[in-house]
Amino acid sequence: MNPVIKQFKFGQSTVTLETGRIARQASGAVLVTVDNDVTVLVTVVGAKTADPSKGFFPLSVHYQEKTYAAGKIPGGFFKREGRPSEKETLTSRLIDRPIRPLFPEGFMNEVQVVCTVVSTSKKTDPDIASMIGTSAALAVSGIPFNGPIGAARVAFHPDTGYLLNPNYEQLKASSLDMVVAGTETAVLMVESEADELTEDQMLGAVLFAHQEFQAVIQAVKEFAAEAGKPTWNWQAPAANTPLLDAIRSQFGEAISQAYTITIKQDRYNRLDELREQVIAALAGEGEGKFAADEVKAAFGEIEYRTVRQNIVDGKPRIDGRDTRTVRPLKIEVGVLDKTHGSALFTRGETQALVVATLGTARDAQLLDTLEGEKKDPFMLHYNFPPFSVGECGRMGGAGRREIGHGRLARRGVAAMLPKDDEFPYTIRVVSEITESNGSSSMASVCGASLALMDAGVPMKAPVAGIAMGLVLEGEKFAVLTDILGDEDHLGDMDFKVAGTAKGVTALQMDIKIQGITEEIMEQALEQALEARLNILGQMNQVISQSRTELSANAPTMLAMKIDQDKIRDVIGKGGATIRAICEETKASIDIEDDGSIKIFGETKDAAEAAKQRVLAITAEAEIGKIYVGKVERIVDFGAFVNILPGKDGLVHISMLSDQRVEKVTDVLKEGQEVKVLVLDVDNRGRIKLSIKDVAAAEASGV
C-alpha cells in the first residue's frame, strides 16, 4: 500500500499520523509524531484464530523507550536495553486499560501492541503520543475494536485553570498531573495525582480532557477511512440460552443464597461445591448435555447476573452492607519494634502491613531515564503474596500489577510529604498485603500515611484512600463504597480516590462499559469523600499528626552550610579528609556544590562528632577571640601556634609577655598548649596572635 499521512491540530500541538512506510507486515502500524518533539512507532498484530484453551482475552501491550531516541547509549556491561523499567511498565498499563474494554465480548484472538519511542526531545512524556498511535494502529488494522480512543494529559493551576498536554516544565508548576482516555461518548480511564484539589476541580479536569481529545478521535476516524484495512469477518459466539436456562432453573436460587455468605473463603467453598454440582448435572456427551468448559463459563455468567441484579434491586451487598458503608476498620501503629515506622491497617478482609524506613541521601533511587539520570528520594513498594488470598503461587520479583498498585499508593501520599530541604531523608515505604478482599492499594495508602507519621516524617496532613464500584443495568445504577474483590470483578467501574480532609491527592478510574454519565461520576466522588472523611476520622483517633521525634532506630541527620571555597578543605586531597572523618566518626557526609552539607549518623553522637570536625576545618579565626592552641614551630622572631585545623597564627616575640623576652624558647616549647588572642587577619589570611593580651581580654569578658 502507498504511505498515508494525516496531520491535525491537538490543542497547541501538531500531530502527524503515518502508515504504509514502516512495519508493513504488522496488522496495523502507525508512526506518530507530536510537534517534532516525540516520535513513536506503534504496531498492532492480531492472531487470525483464537486459542480455545485460553479462557481470557490475551491482549498484551509493550511500551519501550529506546535510548537512541534521546541520543544516548545504554549503560551496563552489555550496552543494550534490558528488562522494562518501572516507567515503561506503568505506561504499558496506561495504554492497556482504555483499549481492553473496547474489544468485543467473546473475542479471544491474541492481540499484541508494541509502542517504541524512536525519537524524543526530552521535553514531553511520550505516553500520550503512544496512546494516540495505539488508537490509530488499531483503527487501521481491521481487528474488531469499538474505538477509536482519544487521550490527553491535563495540568491545573489555580490562576490559569486547566492546561492541555503540558510539557515537563509546565507540570512542575502544576497542582495536577492527569491522563484521561476514552471514546467519543465516554471516559474509560483516568490516572492522576494532585495537590489536594476539590472533587469539582478533578471532575472538571476529566470533562475538559474528554472534550479536548475529540479532535484526536475525529482525526483517527478520517485516517482509518483513508488507510484502514477491511474489518475482520468475526462473529461473537451466540449465548447458549438452553444451558443458561437450565442452570438458572435448577441452581439459580442456590447461587443467589451462596452470595449471602459474608465470609469470603466460606462463600468461595460453597460456590465451588455448586459449580461441581452443575458440571455433574449438565456436562457430558449425551442428549441434553454440554461441554464442561461451556458449563463453567455459563455458571460464571449466572454468578455475574445474580450479583449485579441483587445490587441494582437494592438488596444487601455480598457481605450484607448497603451501598455507602465502609467495612469495619482496625488500625494499629508502631507494631514492629526495630523498624523506623510501622502500621497494620485492616479493612474487613483486606489487610496491609506497612513499614517506613528512613535513609541517607545516598540511599535515593537512581533512575536512568531518557531525560537523563535522576534521583528519587521517595519509594513506595507494594507486595501482593499469594497467601493474601489463600492460594499457593509464584514468588519472585514485582509483577506489572504490583508496580501499578505501588505507584497509585505513592501518588496518594507523595503530595503530603515534606520538601527535601525540610526533611532531607530518603524514604522507603513497603506495603505487604497480608489479606486481600478488594481495595488493597487504598489500604496501602492509609497504611503508608500511618507508618510515615509513626516514623516522625512531618506529613502535611494524613491521607486515606477508598475504592468505589458501579453496577449499571439499563436505567438503574448503584455506586458502591469500599468494594470487595468480587464486586470489582463483577462490576462496571473501578474508581479509586485518595486524599486528605481538604482535597484529592490521587484519582484512578477504570470503566469497563460505555454510558458512565457525569451524574454517576459526581455521585461516586461525593460518596468517596464521605467514606474518606470517615476513614480519616478513625485514623486520627490512633495517630493524628506525625511524631515529634524520629524513631531511635532511624539515622540522625544534621544539616549545615559552608562557604563554597571551603569545600575542598573538607574533602581533602583525593578525598582523604572526608574519608577520615567518616571512618573515625562512623557517619556519612554528603556535600553539594553550593556548600550544603548533610551529615547522617547511625546515632546522634556520631552525627554530632562529624559536624564538629567539619566546623573545625571550615571555621575562620575571629578577631578578638581567645583560642587554645598548640605551639607548632618556634623561630627567632616568634612562634607559630595552631588554633584551628589547618590554621596557624604567628605570636611575635614582642607579644609573648609584658616582660622583655630574649629567646622565644625561654617562654615556649614546641607542642605546648597556650591561650592566644587573635589580633588581626590580613587580606592574605595570615593570622596575628598575642599571648600577653589574653589576661586583659579575659578580664574584659571576651
UniProtKB/Swiss-Prot annotation:
Annotated S1 motif domain residues: 624-692
Catalytic activity: RNA(n+1) + phosphate = RNA(n) + a ribonucleoside 5'-diphosphate
Cofactor(s) annotated in UniProt: Mg(2+)
Gene Ontology CC entries for this record: cytosol
Similarity comment: family membership: Belongs to the polyribonucleotide nucleotidyltransferase family.
HAMAP family reported for this sequence: PNPase (MF_01595)
Protein name from the UniProt record: Polyribonucleotide nucleotidyltransferase
